[in-house]
UniProtKB/Swiss-Prot annotation:
Residues in Flavodoxin-like domain copies: 4-191
Signal peptide stretch: none
InterPro entries in UniProt: Flavodoxin/NO_synth, Flavoprotein-like_sf, Flavoprotein_WrbA-like, FMN_Rdtase-like_dom, NQO
Cofactors required: FMN
Record Gene3D superfamilies: 3.40.50.360
Organism placement in taxonomy: Bacteria, Pseudomonadati, Pseudomonadota, Gammaproteobacteria, Chromatiales
PANTHER family: FLAVODOXIN-RELATED PROTEIN WRBA-RELATED (PTHR30546), FLAVOPROTEIN-LIKE PROTEIN YCP4-RELATED (PTHR30546:SF23)
Name of this protein: NAD(P)H dehydrogenase (quinone)
Binding positions for FMN per the UniProt entry: 10-15, 79-81, 114-120, 135
Residues involved in NAD(+) binding: Y12
Provenance organism: Nitrosococcus oceani (strain ATCC 19707 / BCRC 17464 / JCM 30415 / NCIMB 11848 / C-107)
Top EC class for this record: oxidoreductase
Cofactor note: Binds 1 FMN per monomer.
A GO molecular-function descriptor: NADPH dehydrogenase (quinone) activity
Length: 200
């Protein structure tokens, strides 16, 4: 059985919604066991609540120790000035022992994100994330243009060959569109199919 983890951080719920879509796509592939988890929050609860954070999220908290158990990990992070968020960075900075032991070498890695606008760092957030995965020896998988939703010119939409993304607007009022969720589901399915072949 191929084991795949969707691991995310979501402050306002946009990445959480995308994560569920990614997991849905991955679950559509037979003989792939999909787990959905999130990284720990760093902000004190009161500060997070005052900032409007969505604190009630069903996904359990992941541990660094469990990462080698999976054949693939699809990471989801909101952008922070074109980079991953501090919560995800803090989590990954604790994976030094996996780097030392080579525990993640050959694992499949993929990334999706959320930004405030079309030009808010969708692609740089994902590509800058890739450097961490490459240092761990992971094999990066994106979203090929066989995903027709990437070619949608009829609306403003996130998504690129680097990975799925959504545009939240500066005030967070915009929720992931059906086109963006389609790309997210495609990414989950594509990574699952690729990983299954690698494991076999």
């Amino acid at each position: 059985m191929t084991k795949l983890l969707v691991l995310y951080y979501s402050m306002y719920g946009h990445v959480e919604t995308m994560a569920h879509a990614v997991a849905e796509g991955a679950r559509s592939v037979e003989e792939v066991e999909v787990t959905l988890k999130r990284v720990p929050e760093l902000m004190p609860e009161e500060i997070a609540r005052n900032a409007g954070a969505k604190l009630a999220q069903e996904a359990p908290i992941a541990t660094v120790d469990e990462l080698p158990e999976y054949d693939a990990i699809i990471f989801g992070t909101p952008t922070r000035f074109g980079n991953m968020c501090a919560q995800m960075r803090n989590f990954l900075d604790q994976t030094g022992k996996h780097w030392m032991s080579g525990a993640l070498i050959g694992k499949v890695g993929s990334v999706f994100t959320s930004t405030a606008s079309q030009h808010g760092g969708q692609e740089t957030t994902i590509t800058s994330f890739h450097s961490t995965l490459l240092h761990q020896g992971m094999v990066i998988v994106g979203v090929p243009y066989s995903c027709q939703a990437l070619l949608n010119m009829n609306e403003i939409t996130g998504g690129s060959p680097y990975g799925a993304s959504t545009l939240a607007d500066a005030d967070g009022s915009r929720q992931p569109s059906e086109n963006e969720l389609t790309i997210a589901r495609f990414q989950g399915e594509h990574v699952a199919k690729f990983t299954k072949k690698v494991v076999e």
